[in-house]
Amino acid sequence: MITMNYDPKIIERGKLYYRNNLVKYCIKYKNFLFGEVVGSDTYKVKVDLDNNYFGLCTCQYKYNCKHAYALIEAYENNNYVDAEEIFKEIEDKPKEEILKILKNLVVKYYLWDEFLNTDSLLNKAIGLIKLIPLERKNIYTFKSFLRNQFVKNADDEELIKVIDEMIRADLDFNNSDIIEALTIILDEIFRRENKEAIKKLINLYRKHKKELWIVGDYLIEYYDNYFDYED
């Protein structure tokens, strides 16, 4: 029986990260797991399967953290790429066959993010939102993710979508941290001055005035008459 030196709370958080699709990829090579896990940033993780699943991570906690356990959870659920099997498959094959195998690998394991760098930050944002009601401290991860990765790379539709997902998650919009997260997104929307995006935001505001009360403050500050943004 394998003894893993992970705190029960870390194990539970790691499982939640895996369930919410925050493991970008997991590759097994020899007796190690390699992968990336999304938190407030994207962290590189390595797990030694021969050393009680000891985990190394580029996050501030460094060792046996929730990101490492999320990678273990991917492995335990057979959601990983076996690099040695791939190497055996392509050994001595002609170039055309190798390219075909690599193409199938990319499609099968959704690894095009690593090849094309087009990772869906929206899905990661939604995954983090789902974690907030389960443990309060996840709001800090979400805020950091918004600042460091999401708002500068998301398109206008994605910014609106994340606000909608925050409402769907039934978050407390009177909580200062939730409001701060919302203002990070709103600041970006109004900075861009995209009229169509602001129209969609106003429509969302009308449906959810209780939750999005702070949007009214933005409209007063930025526009004398927000009805100019109606269709």
UniProtKB/Swiss-Prot annotation:
Keyword Zinc-finger listed? The answer is: yes
InterPro entries on file: Znf_SWIM (IPR007527)
Q: Where are the zinc fingers (SWIM-type)?
A: 43-76
Tell me the superkingdom of the source: Archaea
Report keywords, A-Z.
Metal-binding, Zinc, Zinc-finger
What GO terms are given for molecular function?
zinc ion binding
Q: By its UniProt entry, which Pfam families does this protein fall under?
A: SWIM
Kindly provide the name given to this protein in its UniProt entry: Uncharacterized protein MJ1493
